[in-house]
Each structure stands twice: as C-alpha cells, then as structure tokens.
Amino acid sequence: MQQNSEFLTETPGSDPHISQLHANSVMESQLLDDFLLNGSPMYQDDSMAHINIDEGANFQNFIKTDEGDSPNLLSFEGIGNNTHVNQNVSTPLEEEMESNRALKEEEEDEHENKVFNEKNIGNPAHDEIVFGRKETIQSVYINPLDYLKVNAAQLPLDVEVSGLPQVSRVENQLKLKVKITSETPLNQSMLYLPSDSISREKFYLKKNIEDFSEDFKKNLLYINAFVLCAVSNRTTNVCTKCVKREQRRAARRKSGIADNLLWCNNINRRLVVFNNKQVFPIMKTFDNVKEFELTTRLVCYCRHHKANNGFVILFTITDWQNRLLGKFTTTPIMITDRKPANMDTTKFNNTTTSSRRQLTEEESTTEYYSTDNNQLSKDENMPFQYTYQHNPYDNDSQMNNIPLKDKNVPFPYSISQQTDLLQNNNLSLNLSLPNQHIPSPTSMSEEGSESFNYHHRDNDNPVRTISLTNIEQQSQLNQRKRARNNLENDIGKPLFKHSFSNSISATNTMNPALHSMQDFSMKNNNNNLPSINRVIPSQGPINGGIEVTLLGCNFKDGLSVKFGSNLALSTQCWSETTIVTYLPPAAYAGQVFVSITDTNNENNNDDLPQEIEINDNKKAIFTYVDDTDRQLIELALQIVGLKMNGKLEDARNIAKRIVGNDSPDSGTNGNSCSKSTGPSPNQHSMNLNTSVLYSDEVLIQKVIKSLNINSNISICDSLGRTLLHLACLKNYSSLVYTLIKKGARVNDIDSFGLTPLHFACISGDPKIIKMLLNCKVNYSLRSHNGLTAREVFIANHIHSKEIDKKQDNRDNHKFVHNDTYISEVLSLFEEFQNGTKFTDSVETDSNYSISRKYSQSSFNSSLLDNESLNENLFESQSMINPTSMEIQHPTLQLFENSSYSEYDQSDFEEDGDEDLFVTDEVEKPGVACREEQSELLDIGSSANEPEEDNGSTSLWNRVLHRINDDLPKYEDLFPLSWGKDDKLKTTNQDSIVEQSASNIENSENSEEEDYEEEEEFLKKQFNRFFQNKQNFRNDKMLIFFWIPLTLLLLTWFIMYKFGNQDSSINHISELISEYLRIALAKFLLGNERMKTAFRSKLSNLQTTRMLNDLIVS
C-alpha cells in the first residue's frame, strides 16, 4: 500500500494528466473490488479488517507498477524523467479478471464450508464438511425394481414431488419441490444426495459418507432417484452418446476443463442429475413437514431407450441404516429434442382443447343462435346468411340447396358474415379459421364445387363426403380434390359438433333432405376418440420392422396401435395428427385392419382396453407382403460371400459373380425336369447331368451344409434378423434344424427384442416351438413392446374372430385351429416353465439338446412323439413341382425333410458315425423330378431310390458298392479335355444365350417382367452352381495325377536335402538347375547380350582389384 500511495503522489517532473488518469483507474478497480466483496454473501458477517486485507490483495493484483504489468495496458517508467508508454503487455485484462474470479470462488467455497460446519456440526474437527472431490467414485448398484414392490401407503413418510412438466429437453433444468410429511416429528435436518446423480465435482463431498461420525449420519435423510420407462417400468442407463454430449457441454467453460468427469466415469451413473451439493440443509423445517427444492436435469432422450410413453422418476427416502421410509413416483415426462416454441404451442393447444370441453351444448347453442334465429324469423329467404352464421366451418352442409343466383353471391359478403360471427362470440373459433381453406371467387362455380361438399371428419369415423344433391356427378371431383383438403380439414375441423344437430332441426322446413342426417350427427357424441385416416406406406413385409406413419386426428400419448391382432413394435405420438410406429411381424400375407387401443380412456368403464371402431366405409387397411424367401436368399448369399471374399457384400453382386463363374459349365446340364415325362430305364446313367431345381428351403439348406464349422451363419440384416429368425417365421423346420445343428444362436434378438421363438410363435408351428424349447431357449424374454413368446402365440392364434380369415388366407401354412392344438402348444410352455421334460417322448437320452451331438434317428423320433400334434402339422412346401410325384402324408414328409441330405456333404459333418444307420436313408423331398434306379441292392432291396445330381448316395450304399467299382474312364481322368464335350458345352451355352435373349426380347414392354426373369435366371444359375459341386470321392484327377506328382517331388526333395552329396540325385539336380539358369538367361538377354554383360562384369572386377592394390600400398 505504501508503494501504491507513493505512486499516487504527484512527483515533480511528472505529467499531471497521466497521474490523474492512473488515479482514476485505481479508483475504478477499487470500486469493482468493493462491489465483488460487498456483493458476496460470505463476507457480510466478516469484519472490516478482513475486507481491507482482501482489498489490499486485490489492489495489488490490479496495480503492479513496480513490475510494469498494469492491467490498464499502460505502464509508466522513469517517473520524474521522460515518461514512456509501453504497450507490450504479456497478460490481458480478461485473463487477470478470470484468475481473480477463480480465486474468489475457491475462497467462497472454503468460507462456505467453514460456515456450514460451524452451523450444522457439533464437532467441526471430526465432521468437517468440505466439498470438492477428485477421487474416483466407488458406488454400489441399487436395483430400483426392489422398491416398486413396496406399498407406499405402508411407509411412515408421505412424499410428494411437484414441478415436473410433461415435456422437456436435456438442456433444461427442472426445479422440483419435494414435500415430506410424517405423523411423528422428524429429527433430521439435512439431506444427502446419491453419488450417482451429482453433476459437478465441486458438489461432491470430499470424503466418503462412511468416514463421518454416526451422529452426523443420523441427522441425514438419504434421497435416491431412479429413472424408469413409463408403463413398462424398465430400468434406464445413460447411453454413451449422451455421456459424450455431457462432456462437451461441461467443457464449454473458458478453462476448457470438464468438471463432470466423476459422473461420466461412474459405472452406475444415473439418468437424473442434481445441481445441488451432496449435503445441504432443509429450507423449511417443521415438526412433521420438511420442504426443499432440487435442481434437476434428465440427460438422455426417451427415444434412446424406446420409451414411447416417457420417463417416470422414482424417489425414495431412507435413513442412515438404509431402511425405506417413503417413496414417490412422478408423472411421465417426455425428453425430446423439440424446440421450446413447439412445446409452448403444444401446451397452448392442450389448453384450448380443455377449454372447448368445458363448453356445454346449451351454452354453445345459446351463443350461436341468440341473434341468428331472430334474423331468420324476419326473413326466411336468406339461407346463405343463416348457413354461415350457424357455423362458419359447417357451411358446406347447405350450399347445394342454394339457387344458382345465390351461389354467385360475391365472396366478400360471406367473409363479412364470418367476421361478425367471430366478433359476437368470444370463443376460440378464430384459432382454426386461418387454417380453413378459403376458395377463390373463380372456384365458386359448378366446376369448383369443392367448397360445396361437406367433409365431416368425426373422431369416430373416417372422412365422409356428404353432398345433399348431385352426389354421383361430383364424386370424381371430390376424389380429385380430397388430397388437398385432408390436411386442412384435420386442422380446421368443426369445434362444435353438437350444434350441428341443432342447426338441422332448425332448418327442417327449408330442406327435407336434412332429416336423414339427424341420426348420423347424433351418433357423434364423443369428440375425443382418435381416428386413422391414412397409413403410409400401405403395405410391408410379413417379418415387419419397417416404419409406418399413421395420419389422423385426436392422437395422444399412451395409445397402442395394432395391425390385425399384433401389437406394434414401437409407437411414438408426434402430434395430434401423426403417429409413427413400427410394423409387427405377421404369420401370413394379406390385408389387416389397423386399430388404436386407448388403455387410459376416462370414458371406458370396463377394465379392458377400448379399441376404436372404424366405420366400414373407410377403414384403415394395411397389406402384408411375403418376401421372406428373398431375404433368406440374400442372407445366405452374404454368408457365401463372406466365406469367399472375407467381407460383406451386396447379395446381388455375389449372385452375379457366382453366375458369371458358373455360366461356361452350366451348359453341360441336360434337359430340365419339366421336359421329362417319366422315368426310363436309362435314366440312372444320365442322372449325373440332370438339371434339378430346388426350393428355397432346400437350396439354403444346401448352402449351410456346404459351409465349414467356423463359418458365421448368424449374420444379421439391418434389423438384426438372422437366418434362424426368418426360417422360424416361414415354418422351414428342416432349415431350422440344420441351422441349430450348425451352431446358430437361439437367443439372438433383433432390433425390437424379438427372438426366433417369437417368430415361431407368430407362425405357430408346434414342431419348431418344441425344437427351440428343447434347445434351452429363454422363453421368458420380452420384446421391446413387452410381449413374451407365449403372449405372441395367444395374440395370433386364440382370437376367434380372425381364425376363419387366417385359414382362408394362409396358403402355405395350413394349421387346424382347434382347442386341442392350442392347449397342447400352451402346455409346452407350461412344462418348460415348470422345469419338466416331455414325458410322452420316446427320447430317453438325458442330453436332449439339438445343439449337442446325438443321433439323427433319436432327434427324428423326438419330433414325432406327440400324435395329436402331428395331425396339425402343415403340408410340406419344399418342392417346386409337386405334380410330378405322389403326395405323401405330411408326417412322412416332415420326417423326410428333417433328415434330408445328411450324407451328400458328409465330409463337413462333425460326427461321421451318424450316417451309418440304414434306417436314416429316406427319400429326399427337395427334388422336383425323380428317376427310378434300375439296379437292385445286394441286400435284396427292390425299392427305387432317387439320387442327387452329383451321384452321391448314402455312406452305407457307398460301402456296399465300392467292391463293384470299375476302373476310371478317360473322361473321368481328364474332364477338361478338348473334344465333343467342348462342342456340347459351346452349343448348350449358345442355346442358353439365345434362350435368354429371346426371353429379353419378349419382355421388353414390361420392366417388371424383365426384373422377374432376371431373378429367375440368377436363381437357376445359383442352383446349378451348387448342383455341379464335385465331391472328393469323384475327383479322379486329384487322386491319380496331383497326389502322385506331389509325392514324387517331395521324395526327390528329401533325398536331395538329406542324402549323400556325391549321389546321382544331387548331380542331376545341379545339372538341371544350371541348364535352367543358362536357358533363362539366354531367353531374357540373348547370347550376345549375355557375353557383353559378363565382359563388363569382369572388367569391373579387375579395375576394383587394381584400386584396392593402390590403396593398400
């Protein structure tokens, strides 16, 4: 201070203006210091000496004349001499001010800790409360579901939380008011917040709560807050994306250091955070009532947790011994990223809607017709004026009865009538008036009859176009203009529907046709029911998963959407006119009705949910399309492409590559099965070259069996569906069996939480359901819409109203829907839920699991153990052309389908002993045409057996016929030789090209036909690719040429490497290598070039030697 006072003294020779300027800067800094110190609440109780000390310290920070770094960016050197102004300042004023503020914040925190300890703690030395923590939080996870089971009425404390809005954002801070009421006096005076919900490091206690004394902990009420999904009560955790956003949000400070790292690094961090200190005193304390406020934020969006109904916050109050004293669950809150303007508009609309409901029918009638009826009694020749004064939004109901000269009334007249009406009625009618479509003067003609049609949009019924006259003439015009008026009528729909019936009764003498509308208008008593007007898109796949938008009116949160009998996978209400939902899977293709279920309807007196009935004239219809086979083939192609190239590619590119590689050899196949009229004695010798077409199930099954054990068969599509999901939906039991045996995961879930068991219950195949249950599948898993597999089965197969429709539309899956079938399928779940096995099964092996190794016949017998279930099994759909073979019993076909083709790829099987059973050799149902075998087996069997295109038979038959095998033919040893085969291949290839060219020429007029033919061609080539695959047993070239050559070369190398160096083998090897080098050099360089190269090398060697001799000497 002395130095500063000397500086303020005007010295001789100094400029008085500069001295005065610096004195003014000192006074400004002093005033700023006084404001900061006196404005802070922590210094109000201190002495003036403490303030003077802080003033001196801050003054020294601001004024440093001896060091030449004044905060005023001016330093004075050589007082009394020539004054020099130095503008090269190292530290700006803003950084100096920021450091002072940080210093003061630390001092405030220390002072607050000191004052808090002196006021609230009896022993400051032991229970000193210090805030600000740097150590990692080690918290214990608490399951909030344990508290939901406790009845709040039986707890000693009554907790109430208020101030939570319906919609908020992650950036908005919520100020919650908590009130705790008790019958007995409460001794606690402070609150303790959980460590998992503290947002900033400076709010944490520096020590753990366990380090404090017992008396201090008894004086605390422990509050816990958990965020759950509304309705489903599913627990939530902050997603990684939102955690990173919170880190960026905290790092926006000038220092650039995030102060929420403790919360971010905490494993048990919660979705709700508090901007309060971890321990703070209660503001309002009474004997039996405690009140305080919490500053809260919810830091994750509802859509990240698929909480369509929002979040609820569960508050619990415990004591220091972790005994539950009270709990409270808040109302749902939606955390969205909508702007505040949108939320305010929504709130305003809700207020307007509630004000409309308070208006009774008598009041609306009185306000509307208090003046208009008097005018009507004076002059009844003014129907146009009466129509507009009755209701400006229902003016179309009587426009068609106006004479032509009245229709041509100038339009400003009608606007003035509406303006007078709105001025007389101080209602909310003007809110929807700007949204009403205002016709132009040119549209008020016979062609522009759009405004004359009354589009009555009721909440119970879809759009109805009501015209009192000339309906047939205007129907086409209404359909053409309906698209433009739909959205406008949604917003500007009639606000008073009860007054419409009153207007009809008042105008019965004017138009007798209005009598027929009375009954219709009286049915529209409830204006709060939602209705669906349009579904976008109107069709989708049966496996679901696509986004579907519903357009309508009176939508709200909490509604459930059903497609037929299936609940939507997810539902999000965006506004009163828009709902976005995700399509659920269905068991069959066809049209279903889209309905809305309101479980929270106040007018519903029953306990069951109320479904909104849609009028028959315009129902919301959605069409399911079956394209699951295409998706199955695409996934199979991706698996093959991953095996071939090691990367995921588009399925079409993989198919084209396979077809391109296989097309030269594809012409070797003979005629297709469609051209064969029947078996002949010579077909056995031609079956190797017979073109065989397979169904999708058998084709994919062959692909899976051709893969090795390490192949990834659980590749999923964009929705998380694997081959097992789609095979269960299509009732491909043989493919399901192959996938499970190859190691497919039975508990995989897709993006909506659906497992393969869910899809099996949708299709309803009892054999697949039993197969999955035997594989220890988790049958209690719930999808994201809260349904288990058993509930999905009940929803799809027990609704009696839809059984007949399902039986008519299900062409590929024919089940017998009866009580016995349903009870037996439900008994499967009950038995596995009770932990019991099938007692009536012939399977006695304890290791009853398909994913483990066990005999094929054992598994087949276990599938067919229940006789009643076999009667309800579907007919096999594995053959493309079933007319060429005799239809067998469904049970036999299932037996064949489950054991088919276990031996054609036996080299890839895990357990080769399974193929040694003669009883396992059964007919193969995937072949579209059959050939009879003319030779008899040595065991005396005279049955005809079909063979595959590659000529492979069972392992048992191969062993029997091995002794009768002849020597290999020349064509077998050299299958790629030039000759007649090459000409035959070229001819067949040209025929295929000509046939494909002719097909393209015939289908040039239709793009759809071209696309279908291209897919059919790719499918045939894909079949031939897997058909022409040659087994190791028939590869004669490998056995008789390559293997002996490899053995010869290997023997030569061993004798050369480890034999005697003077042997003839070494001498011959050296000669061969020398001649090969010489021949290669002559070929590359030529004789003259080689001589020149050697001469240059020799000359270089001589020169180098001479130089070396000179260097040495």
Curated annotation (Swiss-Prot):
It is a single-pass membrane protein. Residues 530-610 form the IPT/TIG domain. It comes from the Eukaryota. It holds the Pfam family TIG. Signal peptide: none annotated. InterPro entries: Ankyrin_rpt, Ankyrin_rpt-contain_sf, Dendritic_Spine_Reg/Scaffold, Ig-like_fold, Ig_E-set, IPT_dom. SMART domains: ANK, IPT. The chain crosses the membrane at residues 1037-1054. One of its GO terms (cellular component) is nucleus. Residues 91-114, 344-376, 437-462, 658-687 are annotated as: Disordered. It is found in: Membrane. One of its GO terms (biological process) is positive regulation of unsaturated fatty acid biosynthetic process. Keywords: ANK repeat, Membrane, Phosphoprotein, Repeat, Transmembrane, Transmembrane helix. Residues 344-357, 437-452, 663-687 have a biased composition (Polar residues). One of its GO terms (molecular function) is lipid sensor activity. The modification Phosphoserine is found at residues 255, 467. ANK repeats lie at residues 719-748, 752-781. Present with 300 molecules/cell in log phase SD medium. This is Protein MGA2. It comes from Saccharomyces cerevisiae (strain ATCC 204508 / S288c).
